[in-house]
Regions:
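Formylglycine-dependent sulfatase
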Residues: 21-471, 480, 491-493, 497-510
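Intrinsically disordered, low-complexity polar regions and short flexible loop motifs
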Residues: 488
Length: 518
């Protein structure tokens, strides 16, 4: 009997060892959640919430279990090139892809391939839904839910329009750029429907009678699709998977159900601290023969209301409502990972393609080189590596996600000799036993509209570099901006022309030169 008991114990021990080894060697799944135009208000860090009453309970909850990068940046603050660099690992410096053109028609990006290709070659199932790349290409995916859809948008019976509540001239910006406000239903309307969604170039009715009797928004559909897919994957637990989930809010038009607007009292809403004539010592507007969109939209918005305060309050109210709406969608996906037993087997990333200026620098858009355009939320949870309440202040950027996933998931891929992949793995920052934070920098670019001569590409564009202390901006005509974030986190004072900052200016300028030559 004693021998029998020893045998049973030994067998159980071997079984436990086998389970441990299998679990240790099992590849981690990956779920990457990417929002559109979500600035650092979605970082999950209270200190970064310059609008104090922003409500993002799901992001905040996830942040407590994640590695939170408090200085994370886009490499270009425009949708298509930002996403292209993220998913290919090729910097705009090397691809020279700076516009919203079709990314795979760029010869360098087409040859480079994507992180989806790398995961598939490593035996992963590759799944997606929503807005991932700016232009959808079916061959990137084994299975896909819904393509990008910026709806719902107001419908007048013939075409998409700006919402009827938006005054002129801002409403002239159209149904996407010039529209915001709660989804509603007009009294005594004779239209069968007053809202449409638009996917693959086709208008589709969006039915809304009340908050309880309505269609799901595109973001809600994508969240529920991901939830159902995770339930299916949790039941199989066979091959590992890479899932990307793309949400469009808070991209314009800023339309979400009214209960999200009700979270914020319009009259008592806290606003960022604005500086009058904030753009006076900057040089972006002087680089173009036309008024850049951000400056133009800002002027249109302000001139449409009785005061600047009223105008910005209306816009920011809609932006915050949209952020809270997408926060719920993020929570649906993360909660599904927990309920389906995938939480401890899955790397989770929450981020955005770039930030957004909410009126800072007299600018209402993205595609600028200042902090609010470039800065993004970046939260990463790696099972058995990330620790709770970990905040990492080292400057990093979206280009670092590709090498991070390759490193942590131990992926193998064919590194083509003529393809330069930039970025550095963040694993040593996530691992608290290492925490290598030394000398990291984030590089960003804005298209100067001068793309006709590839040999002079770098000289013809506008560049920025962000270190732990400084932001330096250099425009193609040689104009410069320098901001000391230790003393001026709002970037209100351009120090580039001050003699006593000449040494700092020369130092950081040389850092940018070195980065652009790599």
């Amino acid at each position: 009997m004693k021998v029998f008991r020893i045998g049973v114990i030994f067998s159980a021990f071997l079984l436990l060892i086998g389970i441990y080894v299998e679990a240790k060697n099992k590849p981690l799944n990956v779920v990457l959640i990417i929002c559109d135009d979500l600035n650092r208000l979605g970082s999950g860090v209270d200190e970064e919430k310059y609008i104090s009453d922003i409500k993002t309970p799901n992001i905040d909850k996830f942040a407590k279990h994640s590695s939170v990068f408090t200085r994370a940046y886009a490499n270009i603050a425009l949708c298509s090139p930002s996403r292209a660099s993220l998913f290919t690992g090729v910097s705009p410096v090397h691809s020279q892809f700076l516009s919203n053109a079709v990314w795979w028609k760029n010869p360098i990006l087409s040859e480079a391939g994507t992180i989806m290709d790398v995961f598939r070659a490593s035996g992963y199932q590759v799944i997606g839904t929503g807005k991932i790349m700016h232009h959808f290409r079916p061959r990137e995916w084994d299975e896909y839910g819904f393509q990008e859809d910026y709806g719902p948008m107001p419908w007048d019976g013939k075409s998409r329009v700006a919402h009827k509540s938006i005054p002129k001239p801002f409403c002239d910006e159209g149904p996407i750029g010039g529209s915001f406000g709660p989804i509603d239903r007009s009294e005594n309307s004779k239209l069968e429907y007053e809202w449409v969604c638009r996917s693959s170039g086709v208008n589709q009715p969006f039915i809304y009678e009340s908050n309880k009797e309505r269609d799901k928004t595109p973001d809600e559909k994508n969240a529920l699709w991901a939830k159902n897919k995770l339930k299916e994957l949790g039941g199989k637990k066979k091959e590992p998977f890479f899932m990307a989930v793309g949400f469009v809010r808070p991209h314009t038009p800023l339309h979400v159900p009214s209960h999200w607007f009700d979270l914020y009292d319009f009259d008592s809403l806290s606003l960022p601290t604005f500086l009058d004539e904030d753009s006076a010592d900057t040089f972006l507007a002087k680089q173009f023969e036309y008024i850049p969109k951000g400056f133009y939209r800002y002027r249109q918005l302000i001139s449409s209301y009785n005061s600047k305060d009223e105008a910005l309050r209306a816009w920011i109210h809609a932006y915050l409502a949209s952020v809270s709406a997408v926060d719920e969608c993020i929570g649906i996906v993360i909660d599904a990972l927990k309920s389906e037993g995938l939480w401890d087997d899955t790397i989770i990333i929450v981020t955005s393609d770039h930030g957004y200026q909410l009126g800072q620098k007299d600018f209402l858009f993205k595609n600028a080189l200042w902090e609010e355009s470039m800065r993004i939320p970046l939260l990463i949870r790696v099972p058995n590596l990330s620790k709770e309440n970990m905040y990492i202040d080292s400057p990093v950027s979206l280009i670092d996600i590709f090498p991070t996933l390759v490193d942590i998931c131990e992926l193998k891929y064919d590194q083509k000799v003529n393809i330069i992949r930039a970025g550095s793995s963040l694993k040593d920052l996530i691992d608290p036993s290492v925490r290598d934070e030394l000398n990291r920098k984030a590089i960003g670019v804005v298209n100067s509209d001068k793309l006709d001569n590839s040999e002079e590409f770098i000289e013809r564009q506008h560049w920025t570099i962000r270190t732990d202390r400084w932001r330096y901006i250099r425009y193609s005509n040689g104009s410069e901006e320098l901001y000391d974030h230790d003393k001026d986190p709002n970037e209100w004072n351009n120090l580039a022309l001050l003699q006593n900052y000449k040494a700092a200016l020369n130092m950081i300028s040389e850092e940018l030169n070195k980065a652009l030559q790599k």
